[in-house]
Amino acid sequence: FQVGGLGIMMISTFFFILSNKRISLKQRQLIMTDMNQPRLSGIVNLIRTTFLILISFQAIGGLLFSFYFKVTGYYDRWSDAFFNGFYQAISAVTNSGFDVTGHSILPYSTDYPFLFGIMFLIFIGGIGFPVIMDFRSWLIDKLTKKKLHQIPYRFSLFTKIAFFSFLILFVAGTITIFFLERNHLFQGASLLNQGVTSMFYSVTTRNAGLQIHDLNEFQTT
């Protein structure tokens, strides 16, 4: 699911870069089409940077989850903690929704730190590489204090639309799930649990397909 999540074109191009092979004009045109870019210039550097950013999020998320699983006692052996930690991180970033247990992430249904971590990684993997690159440029601008053309960095229109669309759908989905399931799935649950669960399903149903309840428990009307 790593190949399916990041894209065969991105991964194959990155290995071309590692092997110092020249990427032909035809290959660059295919990459441009695959990534929906308007121009050829900088396309290889874009893939390299995006690939490294996504892999970095997977690695950092995997390490944090692994140590968290071991410290909190989910797994006794480090090997199991690392395997499951990295698997969950990669699955979240690639928005694949796969699991190795047969019951998704139901054991973590009330583990709020883990759920927020999963939601963040799903967001990173689903928001799109143009938005990620835009935020990267903004962060570099803030850290280096270098202003392009002596004005503060401005996000592109695409980034603004993508981010606010995600935010609107996230809030609307959370509120909808909260009120629809308040007297059904959430009956007897704490307000905190109801809120976090609503947020989680608002995120995961749009991209990742992970679940922390048996879907048969949801109301059907």
Language-model segments: residues:
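Membrane-proximal intracellular helices of multi-pass ion channels
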Residues: 1-221
